[in-house]
Amino acid sequence: MVQSRTHNCNELRLSDAGAKVTLVGWYENIRKVSKNLGFLILRDFYGTTQIVIETEEMMEQIDGVNKESTISVTGTVRERSNKNMELATGEIEVVPEQIEVLGKCIYNALPFEINQSREADENARLKYRYLDLRNPSVKSKIVLRSKIVAELRNKMNELGFLEITTPILTCSSPEGARDYLVPARNHPGKFYALPQAPQQFKQILMASGFDRYFQIAPCFRDEDARADRSPGEFYQLDMEMAFASQEDVFSVIEEVLPPVFEKYGVYKAASKAPFVRIPYLESMDRYGTDKPDLRIDLELVDATGVMADCGFGPFEGQTVKAIVVDGFTATRKVIDSICAEVEVQTANKAFWFKLDEKGELVGGISKFLQDRKEAVVAALGLKPGDFVGLTAGKKLAAQKTAGVLRKLLGAASEKHMRKDCYEFCWIVDFPMYEIGEESGELEFCHNPFSMPQGGKKALESEEPLSILAYQYDLVCNGVELSSGAVRNHDPEIMIKAFELVGLGEEDVKAKFPAMYNAFCYGAPPHAGIAPGVDRMIMLICGEESIREIIPFPMNKNAMDVMMGAPATVEPKQLDDVHIAINFPEEK
């Protein structure tokens, strides 16, 4: 029978010298000095302790044990002669009387060294995730995730929100991404869907008489991976409030999030309430994005007028946006790499020139501007030494390309980017409608359940593209954490809103029957939001990949290489749910 441990591997101190102890953990490494002397590192969840083997017999025993086996060590604590003050246990060591193997590692070689697992190939890390997670630097992110989620729960409870779980098996609904479908065995030809979000359920809860709801909600979307988006599933701090306005939602978020970011984040400064509010159109005009990184103090300048008829082909008949960077001393190589990265991200080119210390326009496209130097300097407010980045295209394309250029220039200029803080902002006043890029027809811009500003009157009397919605995004350091809205709780306004995109009352009833019917029985005005838990933790940890903060993430191809999912299933399993596979033809 295994003797219970008396201490963990991060617990023993100099005051424990002379005590007899039992430690358990993973055999991490050994430094062999001679045939009867070796220094073994024992690691558990909490830390490491040095074990000093001083007998030939015990050295022979450990020679037959592979690294990463789990062992039990019983022995006596003593003071170390060569102390390591960087370790919590660095003043002591344990001299073993007995070593027992608890779980053998049967492999002589590991897929990667545990303490260097972050440098290994990502698919290897994910396949052997149980080894990767033994790396303290990897494990610490998952531990932090647990603490952050607990803190968020506590804060929501303190504010009077009820944690209510909503169904995982539900119906398919048009919410922007592809559904994961689950065949219903007892209902041939019918399917459940995993929820893309608890959107309808939380709104129905408000119509059911609940006042404040939240949950750490799992969401499932069949969409491609990105650095800040995990394919398949993710979690969000989902919340909804009855009889609430946009400002009520803002107040809750501004009370809940900054303390969590400051307490656990790699940066110890976060925006204080109230966060900056930026209308969508203003954000696009000033920053070239609806996800501005406000740590960067650069803004876009309209250069369309001063660049007109300059003879530079890409500018002819286009909107031109400029970004002026003072004190930008980057080399030509850096400038070229920034322009190349803009093209990779946007498929559009970026251009540039400088005003040198002598007041001359040099570099880049400067030869096209010599005849209007004074006008360019005046229009852009240039001073000697200023660098100017430019983009051109249709207005929205020029803005978006400039937004990418702004971010890259900011990151390359220490003077213009404060990197040691969390800068939150609200993007507000989104358009209710837009013209779809593919359809060419009127579509909802964001959330079809948003309340239009001006209500039914605006829908009946205003040009659709001019109507704004009570819709908002929460952004931190250039990352969109969440979208939210004041909901359209009035069936009449809802029908009218959908009519403008070509859907009638019967379509609404067919697509959203439960929510529509619930609202017909008297629903309160309500509003909500759902910050992404994974993205928040990614920012708090200072990680660039969201997969680093998820215990068992899929890879970029939406595959779980550890478990082997997705996988084929037995023919009988398909028969049980009345499904036949129709494979696409090979090209």
Short names for language-model regions:
Residues 1-587:
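Class II aminoacyl-tRNA synthetase catalytic cores and aaRS-like
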